[in-house]
Amino acid sequence: MTDSSHDGVPAPRRILLVTGLSGAGKSSILRILEDLGYEVIDNPPLGMMDEIVTRAEQPVAIGVDSRTRGFDAAAVLAALGRLRVNPDLQAELIYATAEESVLLRRYTATRRRHPLAMRGTVKEGIEAEIELTARLRAAADMVIDTSDLPPPELRQVVEMRFAPRHDRMAEGLTVALMSFAFPAGLPREADMVFDARFLRNPYYDPDLSVRNGLDQAVADYVASDPDYPRFLDQIDGMLGLVLPRFVREGKKYATIAIGCSGGRHRSVTLVEALARRLAAKNLAEPGGTCDSPGKPAHIEKGAAPTDVQSGGADAQGAWPIIVMHRELARQGRSSWRWASRPREHAADVVEGQYSS
């Protein structure tokens, strides 16, 4: 099982390293990936990772956490780095997390022992694991916060992001809008990248530096740049041209990335504004669905500004839209959310407990 290729060139084989906090849903993510056709290996010795990938003939999902023999964040990142230099592989790191209070509640409900709390409390084990895996969260390609995320929606976002092209649950195109920081590297999955570093930078305003683009004051500051409206219009116009062509090519998932210096102010503001535009166009389509900008489907901290700018709906279809802020997620300030939900769920999933 591989993703479809272009011009006869095989697509890189996907290798997913799934890590995170115990009780946050890592095992649930691995089960979903197994249903999608991935070869799943949970907690192999780190020294065997290269051999596992070499022998596998299909996409691989490898679970790695504090229970893994020889676990060390630096060793995991080194293994990931070795995989990424191989042009025949597309290696990505997924980090599952949840708020401490949620993890405590889950452990209380299941009466399971935390792997790092053999001689202490569950709370102490959670805190130790957060510290132990901090470098992995900071380097993750995708941080999934399951605090308020029902299992059916977890399945939905994993399927939309990681299913092979021919097996994606959405019939049409799913659009992911991502903010990121250029110094942290370009998002490997990005189909289009826009550079917002020429806009006014709130970082140099002491009152705004500690905030982010989800804050209305920061969004207003960025939007006050005289070139901001034109830049946003041109990105919107470019997507109006390109996204329908992606659909014609059979592409099922498109990642549009906007970057700035720190990934917290200008890029976040633009992604939020673009998400509102696309969601507003979805509402104009028959059967379109949109989450309220003031009530995101899932966001850890902060709320998107609520002004809505809408363009015409004739250039683009009513597509599911996911918003992800990579740097904010790595810092625990935000997670992914729907800006516009799929019209219907393709998977009939029963809600249940998360597995670590």
Curated annotation (Swiss-Prot):
Keywords: ATP-binding, GTP-binding, Nucleotide-binding. It comes from the Bacteria. It holds the Pfam family PapZ_C. Residues 285-313 are annotated as: Disordered. GTP binds at residues 65-68. Disulfide bonds: none annotated. The keyword GTP-binding applies. One of its GO terms (molecular function) is ATP binding. Gene3D superfamilies: P-loop containing nucleotide triphosphate hydrolases. ATP binds at residues 20-27. SUPFAM superfamilies: P-loop containing nucleoside triphosphate hydrolases (SSF52540). InterPro entries: P-loop_NTPase, RapZ-like, RapZ-like_N, RapZ_C. Belongs to the RapZ-like family. Displays ATPase and GTPase activities. HAMAP family: RapZ_like. This is Nucleotide-binding protein GDI1189/Gdia_1902. It comes from Gluconacetobacter diazotrophicus (strain ATCC 49037 / DSM 5601 / CCUG 37298 / CIP 103539 / LMG 7603 / PAl5).
